[in-house]
Amino acid sequence: MSRYTGSLWKVSRRLNYSVSETGKELRKRAYGPGQHGQKKLKLSDYGLQLQEKQKLRFTYGVSEKQFRKTFDNASKLKGIHGEMFLVLLESRLDNVVYRLGFAKTRAQARQLANHGHILVDGKKVDIASYRLKPGQTVTLREKSKNLNIVQEAVNSKFVRADYVSLDKELVGKYVRYPQRNEFLPDINEQLIVEYYNR
């Protein structure tokens, strides 16, 4: 299954959850899209698990195949499976680029990475799913700092996560792995674990 490229606003309304983390999608119409969008359906346990999985998958913008692979990799790590899964997703290069404020959305961050604008520890990395380790630096190539999407993002009001840092020269650092209470508070990862373990 390929990565979704349609309207994320429709997805957010269908899931009743802001996948962009801004909340803009639900301000005007806080109900599902389409003719029957305003009808409230009672979901089964499976439906709730699937919905939670889709919320997280669309938030990070990854394909089902990548999502499942990351979930399986998390099972090999020490710690609570669901939490380790979220930490692995947060450690993706495109997500850290977004958390640093180099891009306004994860989709923009993914594009910056895929097009070779990002340096990790001074070396070009063009794989958006590259997994960062604490202490690694993330910067933009010198000529990439003047890109419109970068300038707009850097100059916008942005609340940076505590587990990343950015200096005046736009040198970012993945300081440490995030604590569970520092990101995506509305996601119940246990439902996703139950979905894949059913």
UniProtKB/Swiss-Prot annotation:
Keyword Cell membrane included in the entry's annotation: no
Quaternary structure (record): Part of the 30S ribosomal subunit. Contacts protein S5. The interaction surface between S4 and S5 is involved in control of translational fidelity.
Name assigned to this protein: Small ribosomal subunit protein uS4
Family annotation (SMART domains): Ribosomal_S4, S4
Signal sequence bounds: none
Record-linked CDD domains: S4
Pfam families per the UniProt record, alphabetical: Ribosomal_S4, S4
One of the record's GO cellular component terms: small ribosomal subunit
NCBIfam families tied to this protein: PRK05327.1, rpsD_bact
Domain S4 RNA-binding, residue spans: 91-154
Organism: Onion yellows phytoplasma (strain OY-M)
Family in the record: Belongs to the universal ribosomal protein uS4 family.
SUPFAM superfamilies xref list: Alpha-L RNA-binding motif
Protein function: One of the primary rRNA binding proteins, it binds directly to 16S rRNA where it nucleates assembly of the body of the 30S subunit. With S5 and S12 plays an important role in translational accuracy.
Keywords per UniProt: Ribonucleoprotein, Ribosomal protein, RNA-binding, rRNA-binding
GO biological process, one term: ribosomal small subunit biogenesis
One MF term in the entry's GO annotations: structural constituent of ribosome
